[in-house]
Curated annotation (Swiss-Prot):
Residue intervals annotated with topology Cytoplasmic: 24-30, 122-129, 204-222
Protein name: Protease PrsW
Bridged cysteine pairs (disulfide): none
Gene responsible for this protein: prsW
Keywords, comma-separated and alphabetical: Cell membrane, Hydrolase, Membrane, Protease, Transmembrane, Transmembrane helix
Naturally occurring in which organism (per UniProt): Bacillus licheniformis (strain ATCC 14580 / DSM 13 / JCM 2505 / CCUG 7422 / NBRC 12200 / NCIMB 9375 / NCTC 10341 / NRRL NRS-1264 / Gibson 46)
């Protein structure tokens, strides 16, 4: 059991430290990162309950609905809602990159517990593939969500709503595509590899842009 828990924890902690240590100007208080990680862990339980109810009520049927609604939109909406409530007006949210730290912290808390539960049920031999795919993808959805939340935080009132909508719907769409590839496509690996390559490119590009701007600097480009 210790080996399974360690294998489940390791990729999430490693990715979280990677994005946390990339902050260029002023690192976020560690208590904020831990708090958001724990919130992400706790979010797994209501998410699983809602998904269970949707399945039992036959609302969630078919690969498309499961991928884009029950998984993609539901999970990203709940993460987005928690981020907005707990961080958007927080005094420590004073740099664009902070949104990325917050987004990855919460997303990786969610992904880490999900990963541990999967490995307990299916075996530690899946740990490597889980680290490459679901854990990494959750981290990158968090990066993208946090990037656009950061844009909204430091934008004027005319563009704030646009970036808030982007912060929800772009990660939800990408998450839905990820799940649809897994659930609906027969030779999914041939589609998943280029999709993950794109996701890493897109996420790291957003992280680099956010790191380049300090509060009071030039507005971030999309």
């Amino acid at each position: 059991m210790f080996g399974i828990i360690s294998a489940g924890l390791a990729p999430g902690i490693a990715l979280l430290m990677y994005f946390y240590l990339k902050e260029k100007y002023e690192s976020e208080p560690i208590h904020m990162v831990i708090r958001l990680f724990i919130l992400g862990v706790l979010l797994v339980f209501p998410t699983m309950f809602i998904q269970y109810v949707l399945e039992k009520e036959h609302i969630s049927e078919g690969s498309f609905v499961v991928s884009f609604l029950t998984s993609g939109f539901l999970e990203e909406f709940l993460k987005w809602f928690l981020l907005m409530v707990s961080t958007f007006q927080h005094i420590d949210f004073d740099e664009h990159y902070d949104g990325i730290v917050y987004g990855t912290s919460l997303s990786l808390g969610f992904a880490t517990l999900e990963n541990i539960l999967y490995l307990i049920g299916n075996g530690v031999e899946y740990a490597f593939m889980r680290a490459l795919l679901p854990v990494s993808s959750h981290a990158l959805f968090g990066v993208i969500m946090g990037f656009y939340i950061g844009k909204a935080r430091f934008s004027d009132s005319k563009t704030k709503m646009k970036w808030l909508l982007c912060s929800l719907f772009i990660p939800a769409l990408l998450h839905g595509l990820y799940d649809y590839i897994l659930l609906a496509l027969k030779n999914w690996i041939y589609f998943m590899l280029p999709f993950m390559a794109f996701l890493w490119w897109f996420g790291l590009r957003k992280a680099k842009k956010a790191r380049s701007v300090k509060t009071g600097g030039q507005p971030l480009q999309q």
